[in-house]
Amino acid sequence: MGTRPRGVVLAPWAVVLVLVLALRLAGASHVIHRSLEAEAAPSVPASIVSPLLRTGYHFQPPMNWINDPNAPLYYKGWYHLFYQYNPKGAVWGNIVWAHSVSRDLINWVALEPAIYPSIPSDKYGCWSGSATILEDGTPAILYTGIDRADINYQVQVLALPKDASDPLLREWEKPEEYNPVATPAAGGINATQFRDPTTAWRHAGHWRMLVGSVRGARGMALVYRSRDFRKWTKAKHPLHSAALTGMWECPDFFPVSGPGLQAGLDTSAPGTKYVLKSSLDLTRYDYYTIGSYDGGKDRYYPDDPAGDYHHRRRYDYGNYYASKTFYDPVERRRVLLGWANESDSVPDDKAKGWAGIHAIPRKIWLDPTGKQLLQWPIHEVEKLRGKAVSVDAKLVKPGDHFEVTGIATYQADVEVSFELELEAGTSLLEKAEAFDPAYDDDAQKLCGVKGADARGGVGPFGLWVLASADLQERTAVFFRVFRDGHGKPKVLMCTDPTKSSLSPDLYKPTFAGFVDADISSGKITLRSLIDRSVVESFGAGGKTCILSRVYPSIAVGKDAHLYVFNNGEVDVTVSGLTAWEMKKPLMNGA
């Protein structure tokens, strides 16, 4: 246990970083899509890894494929992040748990892979899982192992630190006398749809963990209980399930503080409200509900039963999947991590030598209404801010735009406050377009019809990011206000990358979500993190979040520009805008 398996060769960059770290010390997506089938290809040489559109400050290894974030935790002064990684190429396959450590969740140093096939329970794969801090302060990892060839037969495996005194947790062992700790053999469980154990929580003398599964088309979170964290027994019923949702990948379950309270809670702490999240294999999006937990019955009850179906909320309305939270005891917050896959082609990924990034870590908490979560980039990312430029009280007339100059905007953090300017005696709703209720459950489709170039009443207004000087290439992040059937404003937030690149063979979907915000004052805010091939945006203080991958061919590096635009019929004032260049952190040796 804990030794590197034959055939897993540590790349030179990792060796160097281990030495550097020694001196300093003195991932859902498990379905094997045919387009992502792993090949028996050698590792990609660093010499052909293309830096052109590699992110500057988002998490990624120097090369090859990554997907789900796994088992984030804080231990003895270090943040740990494990993640699904292919050491042999830029496509899915050959998965091991790569391992990086950080003091601040922004600057990362890579260690050797922590978990890899080494016992019968995981001989054919080590898929996603979670970490739990036990009562004595020792971390434990539960993850999904594949123990049979060709059929992806899934079992749950326990791993423990070989040396709990090591703050870097470099070696892990898997006690064969206990593993696998859970199998699909009993209870009529589909053995190929049984994965991704959660962080466990303790209640009434027993540990509980969830494992994602499906029965027919009903997705569910199965409950397992244990007294000693080694021998687990399946409960008679799931914590929760929902019809027609398909397989629940990467479930997550945690308590939240009261409405408006930003302090996070440890997973075993009692909470008045709980969040249950599932990554739906059918849609490849992350959904959550807020509700209550009955610890005696091990049942979860969403506050809004329709939240399992038509009124489902998403962490992010863009390219964001297989997310995982953890409680950060240092900052007393709950932190959300997620995976953003590429949306170019597999040949493109092979050519550039890398695929997949992680979103900037986000702090999440319950909003004052208690009906949704708010998300915001962790404050540590602001340490990367460099040269800044500001714009104040700038009027943008209908059909106009202006450029934000003075900094390099291909790697930037932009915060902007908009204020709608109405003529005396004119209300916001008079100018707003009527909302078609056919789009009530499909903001993304509405954005596809009412994109950034479709002139409207109140909006679209927002940012053109990663734009070329001639605007042939541009990605729009914007708001548009409608008037619903009850005479109330309905706010759409959208990222429209349909003109983001002149390159062919790119997947360029619009992404959108409705913003549950009071815009009667005419004011709304937007923050966008721009990083070469990714745009992460946060509307109305984190009520709606959208991550999009884009691949400009002209608006690259110093040739990328930033604009504010208004394609509505109402004047818009930029009451305040600040944009910062973002520096590159220490990133796994890249």
Curated annotation (Swiss-Prot):
Inducers of expression: By wounding and bacterial infection.
GO biological process: carbohydrate metabolic process
Region forming the signal peptide: 1-28
Residues at the active site: D68
One Gene Ontology cellular component annotation held by this UniProt entry: extracellular region
Protein localization: Secreted, Cell wall
Similarity comment: family membership: Belongs to the glycosyl hydrolase 32 family.
Protein known as: Beta-fructofuranosidase, cell wall isozyme
EC numbers: 3.2.1.26
Sorted UniProt keywords: Cell wall, Glycoprotein, Glycosidase, Hydrolase, Secreted, Signal
